[in-house]
Every structure is written in C-alpha cells, then in structure tokens.
C-alpha cells in the first residue's frame, strides 16, 4: 500500500472469509473480498466493479491451487503486468489462455529469489509489528 501511493488502489482477494479477515486486520489494502480464485469470470466482474471498468495495472497471483491463471489474466488491463508467484501455475494455461481471450498482458514468473530479498523481508517484519505477529502466529 505504501508503494501504490495515495492514488493507487490495492486490493486483496482472499480464498475464504478467514483469510480475508486476516488480511483486513493488517490494513495493507484499500479493498478486500473473498471468492474462488478459479472463477475467472467472477474475478473479472469483481475487478471491473472495483476499478470502474478499467481493470488492474498489476495482478500478483500467489495462490497455491491450480487453475487460477485466467482469473489473474482477465482481471488485468491490456499492457498490464500479471506476476505469477506460485508453483501451481501452469504457464501453458496462462500463455494459451491469454491468447485465447485476446489479452495482451506482460506475464512474469516469480522464482522466490531476487537480490536483497532476505533483507527486504526481514525489514518488513521489523517495521510492522502486525506482520511480525501474524508471521509468528503462522510459522512459529
């Protein structure tokens, strides 16, 4: 939310009410909702609603289930960025699906590593006690 600036819209799509509540308690987004991430048309409709028909500039998919590629692609505007950061992603489905619906989006693959990522992650935990608390609850 910090990086999106005052005019940026950060949206959190969760898979359950529990996950939505967990994210909402961190207050890291402007809008929150939960739905089935494999429901591509539902996700498209929600993205259209939240962006007044403009769709998202950037979509980050970190869902750990299969068949969520099209929901991310349809929620993204043409020339936008879809960042797939899940081992469940099928890049064949993503590439052929985007072509099949005529979406010209830039698709990036997250591999879990980038220079300095460990320091950034640790700094986020140091800077935000809410995130540190959640991290400890989930992984300690």
Language-model features: where?
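Generic detector of well-ordered alpha-helical segments enriched in charged/polar residues
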Residues: 20, 45-48, 122, 132, ...
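A general structural signal for well-ordered secondary-structure junctions
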Residues: 7, 29, 106, 130-131
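Glycine-rich loops and low-complexity Gly/Arg-rich segments
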Residues: 10, 36-38, 56-58, 83-86, ...
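C-terminal capping/lid region of NAD(P)-dependent oxidoreductase domains
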Residues: 53, 123-140
């Amino acid at each position: 939310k910090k990086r999106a600036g005052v005019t940026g819209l950060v949206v959190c799509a969760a898979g359950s009410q529990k996950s939505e509540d967990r994210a909402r308690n961190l207050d890291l987004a402007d809008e929150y909702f939960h739905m089935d991430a494999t429901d591509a048309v539902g996700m498209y409709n929600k993205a259209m609603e939240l962006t007044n028909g403009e769709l998202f500039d950037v979509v980050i998919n970190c869902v750990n289930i299969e068949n969520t590629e099209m929901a991310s692609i349809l929620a993204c505007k043409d020339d936008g960025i879809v960042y797939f950061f899940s081992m469940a992603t099928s890049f064949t489905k993503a590439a052929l699906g985007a072509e099949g619906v005529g979406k010209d989006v830039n698709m990036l693959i997250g591999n879990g590593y980038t220079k300095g990522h460990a320091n950034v992650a640790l700094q986020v935990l140091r800077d935000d006690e809410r995130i540190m608390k959640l991290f400890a609850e989930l992984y300690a």
